[in-house]
Amino acid sequence: MPRSIKKGPFIDGHLLEKIQAAQATNAKKVIKTWSRRSTILPESVGLTFAVHNGRKFVPVFVTENMVGHKLGEFAPTRTFHGHSGDKKAKVAKGGPGGR
């Protein structure tokens, strides 16, 4: 369920201060944050955030298409290694036990 329009988008106060400071100085410095829950505002377009995914910081360059989404959407927390394959088929096709 989307957030009420009357409330406005949520963004952590400390992150908003960093965004405003970066805009005032036109600095291209990466803004490090743990705040995955903060909404991306139009003021943050063109900035790069280092969003924590639980293990490391993932660099996220903000574009216009990202406005309205949360920072955490662009820093995946889980790594998908793929489903296990059929081990019998691998051996029969030409593994060490084949021909």
Swiss-Prot record:
InterPro entries: Ribosomal_uS19 (IPR002222), Ribosomal_uS19_bac-type (IPR005732), Ribosomal_uS19_CS (IPR020934), Ribosomal_uS19_SF (IPR023575). It comes from the Bacteria. It holds the Pfam family Ribosomal_S19. Keywords: Ribonucleoprotein, Ribosomal protein, RNA-binding, rRNA-binding. Residues 77-99 are annotated as: Disordered. GO terms for molecular function: rRNA binding; structural constituent of ribosome. GO terms for biological process: ribosomal small subunit assembly; translation. SUPFAM superfamilies: Ribosomal protein S19. GO terms for cellular component: cytoplasm; small ribosomal subunit. Protein S19 forms a complex with S13 that binds strongly to the 16S ribosomal RNA. Belongs to the universal ribosomal protein uS19 family. This is Small ribosomal subunit protein uS19. It comes from Sorangium cellulosum (strain So ce56). The lineage of its organism: Bacteria, Pseudomonadati, Myxococcota, Polyangia, Polyangiales.
